[in-house]
Amino acid sequence: MRATEHPSACGWTAHSPRTYFASPPTDLLRRGAAGASILLMLAVCWIGGAEAKVVSSDAAGFSVEHQVTVPAQPDDAFSTLLDVWRWWDPAHTWSGDPANLSIDARAGGCFCESLPEGGSAQHLLVIYAEPGSTLRMVGGLGPLQDQAVSGAMTWSVAPEGEGSVITMTYRVSGRVEGGMEAWAGLVDSMLGGQIARLADLLDD
């Protein structure tokens, strides 16, 4: 699978909580039809070369899933997945530099980011790690950290022919202003971009 790059040339970056998923849906929804148009534009721009798949979405939560097939063997694919700094889009970090990202793949470890001036951010908390196979983390990505939600993200890697199939699911439930439906497409588009970048790296 080859994917389109996802630069920040769409007109924004994501180096603060307010822009991690582009402009927060609640802000845009308050602008009525104009805000809805902007929300749609952002989702289309972020989708890039990855196909969005919102499995379900309602007022209580949403579930998204993405799957790619890569030529790498499961152990190599999983190892590259853990090298998150190599493929995570810098436009979707707090610091703007993916070199600050790391995944400590053990229960109690985290997908974390070092911030300037000695700060740090926890993107997700690792609750299950099986080398070469499964990584499960919990938490709210980006501005979802500041909302009354819970989220569970699972990455699974399985043999497929001479390569591997990588599946990522992210399930979020809780309450946010404007309703969960407003967030589903943006989160799905962002995550679709990340797995596409991972697939590109594994295709090289």
Which residues make up each language-model segment?
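Glycine-rich portal/gate segments that line the openings of hydrophobic small-molecule binding cavities
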Residues: 86, 90, 96-142, 200-204
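Amphipathic hydrophobic-ligand
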Residues: 60, 147-154
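Bacterial N-terminal signal peptides
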Residues: 35-46
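Short, cysteine-centered beta-strand-loop-beta hairpins and adjacent loop/turn segments enriched
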Residues: 118-120, 143-147, 174-178
